Every structure is written in C-alpha cells, then in structure tokens.
C-alpha cells in the first residue's frame, strides 16, 4: 500500500474503488485531502490555544500559592495540624489543602499574621505557620506558666489548661504575628491579663456577674459593655470586631477573629496606629505597659501599677 501522510492523516493510492485510477480520478474518496489538512491545522491551533490558557493558569497557581510539586500529603497534614493547634482549623487531617475548610483556615491565618490572603500554602506562609506554632508550643508547655495563669485563678470558672492555651496563642500572635520583643509583649500581656484574663468571651463584670466566661452575653455594639481580650467597649470598636469576625466566618468570641480585629486597628485607626508605632519603638516593659493602657485600651480605670506588676511577672517567666 502506498501510504502518504498529509497533515497527520494517512492516505493510500490503493484505497481507490477501481484499480488503475489515480487519486484525482476517484469518485468515492471519503474525504478531501486539502479539507482534511485544514481541519487538522485548525484543530491543532485550538489545542495550542487551550494549552496556552492552561499553562497560564498553572503558572498563576504556582506564582500565587508557591506550591511546590514536591509537597507530599504528609507535608500538608503537618500544615493542618499546625492550623489546628492555633485554633484556625477543626476539620479532618487528611492532607487536602483544597477543601473549603482548609482554604478558610489558611486565609484566616494569613489575615491574623499579616500575610496576603490567598487561602493557599506557600513557603512564606509555611515558615510563618511553623514559627507561630513553635512559639505556641514552647509557651504552652512551660512548667512555670502557672505563675501567670494563677493571676485569674480566683474566678469560679477558672481552668488552668484553658488559660494556658489562650495565653500561649496570644503570646505567639504578638511575638510572631505583630513582631514584639519579649519586653514589649510582656507589657501588652500584662494589660490583657488584667482586663480579660486572656479569655476571648469575657464580658465586662457587673455587680452580679464576675466570671471569666460570659457565654450568655448577647453581643451588642451599642451597650457600652467591654468584651473580649482587650474589652472592646465603644460602638466603633465593637462594630469593627463584629465586621471582622463576620468576614472571617467566625463568631465574635473567636480568639483569632479578635487578633485580626486588633491588627486592623493598628493598621487603620489613626490613634491606635500611632500609639502602636510608638510602643514598638521602645523596648521597655513599663513603657509598653503604659502606652497600651492609656493609648490603646484606654479603660476608665487607669490602674497602671496592677498591670505593670503583672507585666513584670510575665517577663520573669517568658524571658
């Protein structure tokens, strides 16, 4: 058989219905060679365009996520375990970072720790996550952390393991997420322990209600009652907490939603932004305690001595 290849199609002279006729004399040729060639070229052009589109999508995915093809399921499980420890993830540790739950957890972590909110893993995200988790674990496992947690042991609903967890997460946020030194973080945490005991669902005490947890409190931006880690009180600040938690798909009592709210305050609120900048310029416990008290938290009772005392105790444990 005399086979010719034209545009990827095979044709043969002996395909003719009657011997002796050449290809130009065929009456029942099943296809036209020129049309077939044009069809094949067009098909190739379409495939080329589709491939280019896919190549661009693949390149964009790599560029935005930093995902390396060498990542393994175990690598991704480690990411999920770390997100779980920091309170961002509660789903199955299956190594799939493309589920809605995993992407939400990553995006919320990125928001809290000041990274681009892609919802995808990258080397930068992985490094920050590892640093935050390492910091959390080191603090949570401290044998003498009870010196700090006992500051709120007088409350009837006190649970040492719970305060240990909250404190460790808060310390990791301010040290790894907000870049504070040990002196600065001690001053900030001295204030937070005095205000809320590091409990995110703590509402301002009333004459009849003095607990760490206020699970029955109905969050109201206009009621003038302090709430959360730093006891957000005025309408604008409580509204920001409500909006931030909603954007993250979390309740207002979630500790990470409150971290994200505080970060946003330091970035957009002129007074808080200026005070935060000043705090970070001074590496002293008393200065950071005072600035956080009077310029950032600004409670009615300016009890500096109590807060500074707590800050020094925290520093003695955390240094």
Predicted stretch roles:
Residues 2-12, 27-29, 33-96, 152-156:
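Acidic, Ser/Thr/Pro/Gly-enriched interdomain connector segments
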Residues 68-72, 92-103, 118-125, 251, ...:
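A glycine-rich, coil/turn loop motif that links secondary-structure elements
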Residues 75-79, 98, 102-105, 121, ...:
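Stable alpha-helical elements in mature extracytoplasmic
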Residues 102-104, 108-140:
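Extracellular LysM carbohydrate-binding repeats and other cell-envelope/extracellular binding modules
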Residues 114-118, 134-139, 195-204, 268-272, ...:
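Secretory-pathway/luminal and periplasmic proteins that interact with or process carbohydrate-rich
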Residues 122, 182-199, 206, 262, ...:
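Short, functionally critical alpha-helical segments immediately adjacent to catalytic or ligand/cofactor-binding
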Residues 149-165, 169, 177, 196-284:
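Peptidoglycan-targeting cell-wall enzymes and recognition modules
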Residues 277-319:
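Active-site or metal-binding loop neighborhoods of secreted/extracellular toxin and effector enzymes
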């Amino acid at each position: 058989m005399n086979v010719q290849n034209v545009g990827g199609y095979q044709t043969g002279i002996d395909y003719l219905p009657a011997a002796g006729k050449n290809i130009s004399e065929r009456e029942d040729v099943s296809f036209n060679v020129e049309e077939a060639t044009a069809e094949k070229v067009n098909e190739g052009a379409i495939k080329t365009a589709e491939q280019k589109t896919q190549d661009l999508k693949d390149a964009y995915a790599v560029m935005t996520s930093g995902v390396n093809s060498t990542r393994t399921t175990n690598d991704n499980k480690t990411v999920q375990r770390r997100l779980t420890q920091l309170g961002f993830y509660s789903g199955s540790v299956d190594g799939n970072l493309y589920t809605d739950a995993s992407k939400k957890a990553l995006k919320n972590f990125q928001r809290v720790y000041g990274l681009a909110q892609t919802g995808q893993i990258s080397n930068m995200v992985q490094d920050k996550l590892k640093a935050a988790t390492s910091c959390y674990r080191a603090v949570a496992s401290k044998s003498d952390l009870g010196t700090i947690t006992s500051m709120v042991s007088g409350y009837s609903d006190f649970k040492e393991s719970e305060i240990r967890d909250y404190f460790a997460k808060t310390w990791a946020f301010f040290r790894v997420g907000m870049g504070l030194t040990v002196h600065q973080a001690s001053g900030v945490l001295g204030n937070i322990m005095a205000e809320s005991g590091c409990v995110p669902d703590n509402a301002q005490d009333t004459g009849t209600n003095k607990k760490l947890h206020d699970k029955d409190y109905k969050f109201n931006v206009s009621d003038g009652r302090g709430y959360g880690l730093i006891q957000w009180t005025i309408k604008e600040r409580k509204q920001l907490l409500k909006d931030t938690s909603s954007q993250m798909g979390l309740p207002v009592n979630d500790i990470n939603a409150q971290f994200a709210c505080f970060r946003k305050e330091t970035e957009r609120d002129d007074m808080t932004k200026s005070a935060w900048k000043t705090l970070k310029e001074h590496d002293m416990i008393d200065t950071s305690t005072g600035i956080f008290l009077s310029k950032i938290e600004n409670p009615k009772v300016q009890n500096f001595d109590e807060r500074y005392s707590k800050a020094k105790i925290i520093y003695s444990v955390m240094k």
